[in-house]
Amino acid sequence: MLAGRAARTCALLALCLLGSGAQDFGPTRFICTSVPVDADMCAASVAAGGAEELRSNVLQLRETVLQQKETILSQKETIRELTTKLGRCESQSTLDSGPGEARSGGGRKQPGSGKNTMGDLSRTPAAETLSQLGQTLQSLKTRLENLEQYSRLNSSSQTNSLKDLLQSKIDDLERQVLSRVNTLEEGKGGPKNDTEERAKIESALTSLHQRISELEKGQKDNRPGDKFQLTFPLRTNYMYAKVKKSLPEMYAFTVCMWLKSSAAPGVGTPFSYAVPGQANELVLIEWGNNPMEILINDKVAKLPFVINDGKWHHICVTWTTRDGVWEAYQDGTQGGNGENLAPYHPIKPQGVLVLGQEQDTLGGGFDATQAFVGELAHFNIWDRKLTPGEVYNLATCSSKALSGNVIAWAESQIEIFGGATKWTFEACRQIN
């Protein structure tokens, strides 16, 4: 009798289980359990199933908590390691960033811009530090060559003697840098020796930089206002020059300049003119592997210029609003022309004219990847289309060469920022 009752109990329990789920979970399995005779067998089975589910959930939560504890411990260990490394880096940065350093290209970085500066100096590896010192030496040598050119033009024996003294100092510094590079390659020298050697070299560089700056200041006081060039030695988002004057409304223009660059890929942006509501009102740019382009009201024409060979080149672009006709000249010869470039759109007035950077906003929003790297001089703008003969006179430094009637190249009208420099330059005397 008891066996029959147990069989009926299992059968009823199976029916309850089958009736409580609508999904098919595969082959049916029967579970027998002891329950009182007068108990509700279906309710008992459901309660048992709920208890099993709760037990399973508790086990899963326990496993999750254990895994999270392990993760937290691992992350704490990682944080300790990173904190230690950061402390070492900060200590090394403090040693490397002494007050007597002479660094080319400035060291300033615009906060919050989110742009790549690409010109900040490395603060950790000794080899990269020596590379930066080498760049500084090269920059000082170039400035010295300009002083030498100036002394030849003015036949000053005092300037010549100073030039010889500075050249001797530069030669000594080059020997010190070369010796330090050889020591690094042989694996000699510890961190203390590195710091001491670098301090000596940078102290000499600082002294040399100050002396050349003094000579250049005296040179600037004596040179004509248009006999200068701008130099942008590094691709950064903070090195640029600004023209104090703005442009009037123009229905035609000619823009000409001397350029020298060996930057690759792309020489960057020699100049950009932005107005409220249009950052690309007038832009000359070559970036990436694209050819040089002229933008007017954000409309583009590709130009046939090839100028990144490290030599001086004279370039001009003319444009008229009627049919958007344009012409491009390199070294006095027309190399390309076209039409339908922003036709019937006059150049808007009251904008900001920047040399060396492309503007994403009015007067700012610079991007290092589009910055100009090289040298620029005799930037002039006219409010008309120059003739081929007039362009040729400019490229050959003829006595008949004209100055821009809208923007004329004058040192007093150019402000420099972020480490850009002004050096003496005379077109056709220093060409290549």
Curated annotation (Swiss-Prot):
Residues annotated as binding Ca(2+) 2 are E358, D360, Q370
Q: Where is the signal peptide?
A: 1-22
Q: Where is this region: Disordered?
A: 88-122
Cofactors needed by this protein, per the record, are: Ca(2+)
Q: Which GO terms describe its biological process?
A: axonogenesis involved in innervation; cellular response to glucose stimulus; cellular response to potassium ion; mitochondrial fragmentation involved in apoptotic process; mitochondrial transport; neurotransmitter receptor localization to postsynaptic specialization membrane; postsynaptic density assembly
- A molecular function (GO) term: metal ion binding
Q: What is this protein called?
A: Neuronal pentraxin-1
State which gene encodes it.
Answer: Nptx1
